[in-house]
């Protein structure tokens, strides 16, 4: 009102001058507000460069001192064999660490996956307990795992320059088991994306093809492990954040039941949200490495350091069983149309399992749209996104989050109005908008009760068919960079099992063929909406990229899930078994 009156009082050139002043003032305010964020970007990238230089120097120094070491042979060793050679002293832990430090430095040049070098790994070697199950094993960490003296930024400027006071529990347990954490890896800003880019460290790219996303939010882990720069990593998963990068980068990953592994000490941007459970899980080149990691973490040390974790040690007899399995399966969830390669991967895996003596039974959890649109979205954004948005004050918003942040910033009434207006043409977007509104405590309790009822319903369906495990499609191949943020509906295959809190893992089983690529030209999706169109566009030019399937078990049955994953791996990629 004041601006309008001033404008009316000043004719001609004076009015134009005043308008220019207003614009200049707005720009100046915006520039001033972003000063802190710009400084954080500069400091973060300086720290990243310094860490990478230290990695290069350490690796080169070791190579000069040990010119006869066969680095390629060491890097090719599967993790179980690597551990065996470390325990037998056939390999020195220094040789393993600095070989992987050098490899991580090398692959980072093409992927931008490493954010920090955990330089005390060099002194950690002398402290690593020789009897530990992971003695001498270099381990990479998603940046959200706090590490004493290191920032865990999540790509947000407010977290830059705030080093952790202590290690998170799982990092502490890794060290007690002899492992040597050596790098932090990149994440999408806030970790609420299945792409991998942020203003502090930039875009991480897929090691198979640089125009493709590595997935997210554990995308740095996927890129590093997928390119051979780490034998084992830890990620987190609240909507597919371990499984997307594992699928896109051609590695294995496990999302356990939410509370099977400790989350104490993890850095996050929203605390207290319990409707959809976050999980901590391992990522590696093969299933046996995942099992080894879980075996090491499920120990008395973790149960002592975090008494809220159920004291359930790894059940070896379940993992090593060879009894035939009764496997439920579905080719599609009827929400996200599978790509031709996804459907083929499930059918070929089904045929191989049947040929090996397992029983395959059609199965599809009920009411998947409700689980995704109402239960999951409503649970994640039950405060209307208010807490989430607090992290972005004065900060840049990465393009991978642009649409989400813009929607969450809308007033409650406008979200409702838009949901009503777009419903005839975009029913999925309408449903997501409706459930991104804030709700009262009473309504939140109702939602959480609905989730419990839904979980019991699916378990009853599962048990009615006497299933051991379930085989499902996994989103693949990798999407183009920046496409995940505009293909939100494609989280359906993974998000369902966060809502249900079932353990789920992914195993690569094939690659995209020229025939798959040709068939993708006819892909329209089930709704033909903007998400389906982006998915079709984002999956083009993918011949040769990895394709995975998802393996699911009931809550607390991680060992059975891993056993099923190992069987799929044995049948579909026998070269891993022979190595």
Swiss-Prot record:
GO terms for biological process: arachidonate metabolic process; fatty acid catabolic process; monoacylglycerol catabolic process; positive regulation of vasoconstriction; regulation of trans-synaptic signaling by endocannabinoid, modulating synaptic transmission. It is an enzyme of class 3 (hydrolase). Residues 404-433 dip into the membrane without crossing it. The chain crosses the membrane at residues 9-29. One of its GO terms (cellular component) is postsynapse. It catalyses: N-(5Z,8Z,11Z,14Z-eicosatetraenoyl)-ethanolamine + H2O = ethanolamine + (5Z,8Z,11Z,14Z)-eicosatetraenoate; (9Z)-octadecenamide + H2O = (9Z)-octadecenoate + NH4(+); 2-(5Z,8Z,11Z,14Z-eicosatetraenoyl)-glycerol + H2O = glycerol + (5Z,8Z,11Z,14Z)-eicosatetraenoate + H(+); N-(9Z-octadecenoyl) ethanolamine + H2O = ethanolamine + (9Z)-octadecenoate. Substrate binds at residues 191, 217, 238-241. It holds the Pfam family Amidase. Highly expressed in the brain, small intestine, pancreas, skeletal muscle and testis. Also expressed in the kidney, liver, lung, placenta and prostate. Inhibited by O-aryl carbamates and alpha-keto heterocycles. Inhibited by trifluoromethyl ketone. InterPro entries: Amidase_CS, Amidase_dom, AS_sf, Endocannabinoid_amidase. Its EC number is 3.5.1.99, 3.1.1.-. Homodimer. PANTHER family: FATTY ACID AMIDE HYDROLASE (PTHR45847), FATTY-ACID AMIDE HYDROLASE 1 (PTHR45847:SF3). This is Fatty-acid amide hydrolase 1. It comes from Homo sapiens.
